[in-house]
Amino acid sequence: MCLPMNAGAEAVETAIKSSRRWAYRTKKVQPNKAEIIVADGNFHGRTTTIISFSSDENSRGDFGPHTPGFVTVKYGCAESIEKAINKNTAAVLIEPIQGEAGIVVPPKDYLPKVRKICTKHNVLMILDEIQSGLGRTGKLFAYQH
């Protein structure tokens, strides 16, 4: 699915809402228990919900209380994602290439491993391509490398 939006934060917020709804209605996660796994060093926007799972204290400071329901793992480590998955995991939300503090490219096998893990555990995989998509890496989307 592709979500065309006016802003990256709006797209990420919609993806969060959609994945939570899917978890409650389809995966049968108990109400208000859905979790989304995110990677450290992320930048998905500056809304109140999005800064709740930011690892940048400058983005989070003085804006609490923060929105619950997010689990942070090490970027580029598929094994940390698999360890974090539980019955309440709705989705994994990651950037194929992180771009907030320079260009951080994960190991070549990272995204294929994450895809397999998500499929194995019935978890949605959300890729935020706002900074890396639409030909910026030489392919239409960065996940295609």
Predicted features and spans:
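Conserved N-terminal phosphate-binding loop of PLP-dependent enzymes in the Aspartate aminotransferase
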Residues: M1-H145
